[in-house]
Amino acid sequence: MAITSKYSNKQIEQMLTEMVDVLDKHRAPADLSLMLVGNIATNVLNQEVPAEQRKIIAEKFAQALLSSLDIPKTH
């Protein structure tokens, strides 16, 4: 999602693979996977981000998510 990151691609890919492996292990369908990822994002925001910054960080996160989607263009 991020264009630039202080984290290496290797670190990100390794953690992402491990998280996807857990979802695959439990045969989580798309709706459950999205619910879990959403709950993780909510927990991180509530526990790790100062209250006065949560809304703006959540909005930036939502914008980054939308911009990273593969959405077919319709004419």
From Swiss-Prot:
Database matches in InterPro entries: UPF0352, YejL_sf
Gene3D superfamilies per the UniProt record, alphabetical: YejL-like
Record family assignment: Belongs to the UPF0352 family.
Protein's name according to its UniProt entry: UPF0352 protein VSAL_I1058
Species whose genome carries this gene: Aliivibrio salmonicida (strain LFI1238) (Vibrio salmonicida (strain LFI1238))
